[in-house]
Each structure stands twice: as structure tokens, then as C-alpha cells.
């Protein structure tokens, strides 16, 4: 009981980013579970996804929807709560927050307000895909999602065609075929490609 009280006290005024499972809910660390149980509130992309984690590990907490559609409206109120001393955890639907999601903007704003953030490491889809690909992994480039605007997309694809290092790209399933055709067009047919999903 004393150990639990000390853990709870550690969370009273802290800000966390917490890595969540990218496919298997059992991949959540003990430390991550403890933080998510004890912070005042959790900001998450989709409350339904985070609710699955809480159900799996039998705890409840106050969830705040924080995603690309509402992040700029939510950031000021979240920073206000943090300045008032409330503890807070930021999670994404899967993997580490701030990689291709609006968590990046929240963390930047927190730090500019003198509110350092503690990272609770967890699974990362990009690194998991890289290390299981069989492609060179000592040096790599993370590209994330490519721009949708045609001119910007062409510019990035041309840059990728010149990269010598392994390049990691995110893409949604329904746009994957188009991306593969584009990569063949810009990079040629002799470039090795690995497709990873359900990591």
C-alpha cells in the first residue's frame, strides 16, 4: 500500500506521453499502466480505443478526446489544467504519441510553458516495421505520411528516389496500391520494398 501511495504521489503534478500497444494489448508496460491509472486525465485520439485498454487492465479514468480535428481548440484548456497542477497523460490510438499525430503540438506548447514532459516508452510501429523488414536498419529516414497535394507529393517522391538509406513511409490500406505504383515510377523497379501491418 505504501508503494502504491508513493506511485500515486509521483503522478500528482507530472505530464506524461505514454506508448500504447500497436496490435497486442498485452504489450502495455507495467509502468504505463500505473501512470494511466493514476493521472488526473488522459488525452487520447479516440476515446473508444483507450477505453479498450482501461477495460483490459480493469481501471477507469477521465478521457479527453484529442485528435487532428480538435487539437488546436483543446491545447489551451489542457495547458491551463497543467499549469493548475493537474497530472496528465497523452496517448495515441497505437504506438508513441506525437509521431504523425497532433501530440507534437501539445508537447511543444507544454515545453514552451515550462512544463517538461516525461516519456513512458512503448511500442513504435515505424521501428517495429524496420527491424523486422530485413532491410538495412543502422541508418534510416522516417518520412511518415506523404503529402496529399500533388506538387508537394512529387517533390517528396523525387527526394525519396535519391535516398540511399532505408526509408519508412506510413500509408492507409486503401491508398497503399497507389503509393506502390508511385514508388515504382519514381524509384524504379529494382528498389526493395517491405509492407508491414498488424504489428
Regions found by a protein language model. Give the residues of each.
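A contiguous loop/helix-start segment that scaffolds small-molecule binding in enzyme catalytic cores
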Residues: 165-166, 170-199
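Short glycine-cluster motifs
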Residues: 83-143
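A short beta-strand/loop micro-motif in the catalytic core of glycosyltransferases
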Residues: 40-46
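Conserved helicase motor
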Residues: 66-72, 146-149
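Short glycine-rich anion-binding loops that position phosphate/pyrophosphate groups of nucleotides
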Residues: 22-23, 93-97, 173-175
